[in-house]
Amino acid sequence: TIINENGQTKLNINSYIGKTTINKSQKADDVTIKVVETDVYFDYQTFTFEITNKRDTPILINDPNIDSTMYIEDKNATHYQAYTHELAETDTKVPAGQTQTVKIKYYSRYSSNKVIKYTAFDRIILNYNAYSHYTNIGAYKDYGSIKIEIPQN
């Protein structure tokens, strides 16, 4: 792809469009999620997050039984789901009292007029120890949610 940026012509290789630094965070239930940056590709978009767990139990940022709980949302309220099948449990599980960085890929085909307004984590498992002991996962109810507004340049 050839783009014109700040009066300069640039060539994007391997469908890479560009990077944007964001550094915006949101906190709920003693969990802070910071959106560090995003990389845009022709067929998808990645976001790098720093997740801080100040709880006394490990958390899981994605319910593995439901695919649609991590997404990005555009200005038209369209949701683009995360590629959760590419994430290992070690990517989404944050131990108590620790900060972890994870890069998450989303289904989001490039468009020059697409504006991503939010990243969302709708079903954070706030007590992974308790969750992992449930034989009936549907009975577990200790969930959190964080939605982070993406500033527009």
What are these regions (language model features)?
Residues Y41-T48:
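Short, solvent-exposed loop/turn segments enriched in Ser/Thr/Gly
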Residues F49-P58:
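Asparagine-centered strand-capping/turn motif at beta-strand->loop junctions
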Residues T52, P64, D74, H85-E86:
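Low-complexity, intrinsically disordered/propeptide-like segments
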Residues T1-I33, I59-Y80, T92-N153:
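Surface-exposed edge beta-strand/loop patches
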Residues S25, T38-Y41:
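Short, conserved, surface-exposed binding loops centered on an aromatic residue
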Residues V31-E37, H85-T90:
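Short structured motifs
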